[in-house]
Amino acid sequence: SFEALLRWQHPTHGLVSVGLYPQVFENQGLSARIGRLVAEFALSQAAQWLHDDVPFARVAINVTAADFVLNAFPENLAERMARHGLLPQHVGVEVTEGMFLGRTAVSVLSGLHDIHKMGCEISFDDFGTGYASLMHLKLPIDRLKIDRSFVTGIENDPTNAAIVRAIADL
């Protein structure tokens, strides 16, 4: 699988990860516009790989609450997939726990159910940090991506190893 990640080529700081400029994503309008561009690019690239017979399992798109609230994400995703000739097994969607906080939670949950019905894989990214709750395991999630803070150096950290095993056993 491939994951569509966004990086900013800053003129003085070089390549900057999205995590280092979260204030951009606090503006829902800007976040939604960026989300549309990233989704379109990722799906276009996946279609090109299919056309060129490049083997890949799926491309995963990280989405924000703004994508669901302002972009009608499930409907737009279905339309773009059809336009690019992509099947549900070619596309994954990644969400984080922050999307389920506040007044956008209902829109996000409804949208996730729609995406799940389409047959696209839904992953819960960075699970185990922040406000993650066992209640999140009841969401229409196909895959948990345990946060790297638990898996980095796991072979030397029995506590983190036990936590990861417990999550996997769930």
What is the role of each PLM region?
Residues 1-23, 42, 142-144:
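A short, well-structured catalytic beta-strand-centered motif of the EAL phosphodiesterase domain
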Residues 2-3, 30-107:
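Catalytic core of bacterial c-di-GMP phosphodiesterases, primarily the EAL and HD-GYP domains
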Residues 8-10, 67-79, 99-110, 127-170:
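Bacterial c-di-GMP phosphodiesterase catalytic domain signature
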Residues 14-18, 27, 124-136:
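Catalytic-site-adjacent helices and loops of nucleotide signaling machinery
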Residues 19-26, 32, 109-113, 161:
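Conserved long alpha-helical elements within nucleotide-processing catalytic cores of c-di-GMP signaling
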Residues 21, 38, 61, 93, ...:
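Conserved, mostly hydrophobic/aromatic
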Residues 46-50, 81-82, 109-119, 165-169:
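Surface-exposed amphipathic alpha-helices with a cationic face
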Residues 86, 116-120, 139-146:
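Glycine-enriched alpha-helix->loop->beta-strand junction motifs that scaffold or abut catalytic
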